[in-house]
Swiss-Prot record:
GO biological process entries: selenocysteine biosynthetic process; seryl-tRNA aminoacylation
Keywords: Aminoacyl-tRNA synthetase, ATP-binding, Cytoplasm, Ligase, Nucleotide-binding, Protein biosynthesis
Gene: serS
One Pfam family here: tRNA-synt_2b
Family: Belongs to the class-II aminoacyl-tRNA synthetase family. Type-1 seryl-tRNA synthetase subfamily.
GO function terms (MF aspect): ATP binding; serine-tRNA ligase activity
Upper lineage: Archaea, Methanobacteriati, Methanobacteriota, Stenosarchaea group, Halobacteria
Record organism: Halorubrum lacusprofundi (strain ATCC 49239 / DSM 5036 / JCM 8891 / ACAM 34)
Coarse class of the protein's main subcellular location: cytoplasm
Name of the protein described by the UniProt record: Serine--tRNA ligase
Length: 456
């Protein structure tokens, strides 16, 4: 959330951010409301001063026997009271409108962010792991076909149980997801992260604090009512990311300098209504309604946030390095930068099966497995999260950052395709074997029930 003062003093900076991020907000209306509100507050201060002066003279006039003048003062006091009430009511209305309007303004991109219209103008910063690729089959089978053949992914039963966009991981597929979650948590514990296991349901106030509401209502799962209905502060939603509950742990709190940097990690299932929109994303587990993810959230001093941002990128990368998966780092341009972010990098892993136009020369495609973001004070201001170095010092807003560490299903996709063998089995990455009871190769399972009879 941008402060009123910043918007008031930097309207052209805000206007440029709206253009660069493609956000349609009536900034002129916000500025007009702010100006009228300030004029009313000034008029209200004048009236309160006059009321106090008039009130102090009434007794003096009565004591002096000037009844007519005293009566005039009483009448003026009542007029001031009535006018002041009208002004305060109007000022409260404008302030409420202003607060809601400020929630619609996006974060200002950091000056280092490349300017661009859309994702085609994102900037690739580097690639890792392509100098020593393992040999993959000439025709890598897509994860969605291989997963069904090995009986470790079940899309039909996922749809039967919950509807389209859901899947079931079973057998070694389920073990692989569990292994990845525990492995990721262990890696980040080594990086001094503190574990959090938050509620899966979050209230509207929490969603607003991190910026999911009011802008992204249509993508969220609401527990009661429809997304089109008005919502109250305590209405519940299924969390779209652990960023929401973990950031809001310290909503309306003041941390101490000695607490910072404060680094949390949380595993949660995540729920989003954005499943499969086009192309190969309509198949498999690349884009689904429910998925597992480990999230890292940092609370830091403002002057340290951009250095910590680079550290957070490295902490997410460490998972990919240990899994020995090829990947690249992409910096988002202004047009592809999220509503809340000042700066963002995506970590994209290589999945070699499905060739896509924007994929690498080796074939296949890129899959985003982590977005690492610096929100600066944007979320902290919305959620009221401050810090002070010493007890006697004034509190100021801190900076928040987060990053996926990582999104589990897409790592499963990368493993099933990159570690695929000619015989249709999948080699388990060495780093994961201790988490899978020493299993080195996923060979699959027999089908159960009449489905294994095929067409018979």
């Amino acid at each position: 959330m941008l402060s009123r003062q910043f918007v008031r003093e930097n309207p052209e900076v805000v206007r440029e951010a709206l253009d660069n991020k493609g956000v349609d907000v009536d900034l002129d209306r916000i500025l007009d409301v702010d100006e009228e509100w300030r004029e009313l507050k000034s008029r209200g201060d004048d009236l309160r001063h006059e009321r106090n002066e008039v009130s102090s003279t009434i007794g003096e006039l009565k004591q002096a026997g000037e009844e007519e003048a005293a009566q005039e003062a009483i009448e003026r006091s009542q007029e001031v009271k009535s006018e002041l009430q009208e002004i305060e009511e109007r000022a409260d209305e404008l302030e409420a409108e202003l607060e809601e309007s400020l929630l619609e303004l996006p974060q200002i991109p950091h000056e280092s962010v490349p300017v661009g219209a859309d994702e085609s103008e994102n900037v690739e910063r580097r690639r890792e792991g392509f100098d020593d690729l393992r040999e993959v089959p000439d025709n890598v089978e897509p994860h969605y076909d291989l997963g069904e053949e090995l009986e470790i992914l079940d899309f039909e039963r996922g749809a039967k149980v919950a509807g389209g966009g859901f899947y079931v991981a079973k057998g070694d597929g389920a073990r692989l997801e569990h292994a990845l979650i525990q492995f990721m948590l262990d890696v980040h514990r080594e990086q001094d992260y503190r574990d959090v296991f938050p509620p899966i349901a979050v209230n509207s106030t929490s969603m607003r604090g991190t910026g999911q509401l009011p802008k992204f209502t249509e993508d969220a799962y609401r527990i009661e009512g429809t997304n089109e209905d008005a919502y109250d502060d305590d209405d519940l939603w299924l969390l779209p990311t652990a960023e929401v509950p973990v950031t809001n742990l310290h909503r309306d709190e003041i941390l101490l300098g000695e607490d910072l940097p404060l680094k949390y990690q949380a595993y949660t299932p995540n729920f989003r209504q954005e499943a499969g929109e086009h192309g190969t994303e309509t198949r498999g587990i690349v884009r689904v309604h429910q998925f597992n993810k480990v999230e890292m959230v940092n609370f830091v001093r403002p002057e340290e946030s951009h250095e910590r941002f680079e550290g957070l990128v490295d902490e997410a990368e460490e998972v990919l390095r240990r899994l020995e998966l090829p990947y690249r780092i992409l910096e988002m341009c202004t047009g592809d930068l999220g509503f809340t972010q000042a700066k963002k990098y995506d970590l994209e892993v290589w999945a070699p099966a499905d060739d896509m136009d924007e994929g690498p020369a080796e074939g296949g495609r890129w899959l985003e497995v982590s977005s690492v973001s610096n929100f600066e004070e944007f979320q902290a201001r919305r959620a009221g999260i401050r810090y002070r170095e010493e007890h006697h010092e004034s509190a100021e807003f801190l900076h928040t950052l987060n990053g996926s560490g990582l999104a589990v299903p897409r790592i499963v996709v990368a493993i099933l395709e990159y570690y695929q063998n000619d015989d249709g089995t999948v080699t388990v990455p060495e780093a994961l074997r201790p988490y899978m009871g020493g299993t080195e190769v996923i060979e699959g399972h027999d089908a159960v029930g009449e489905t294994k009879l095929g067409g018979e």
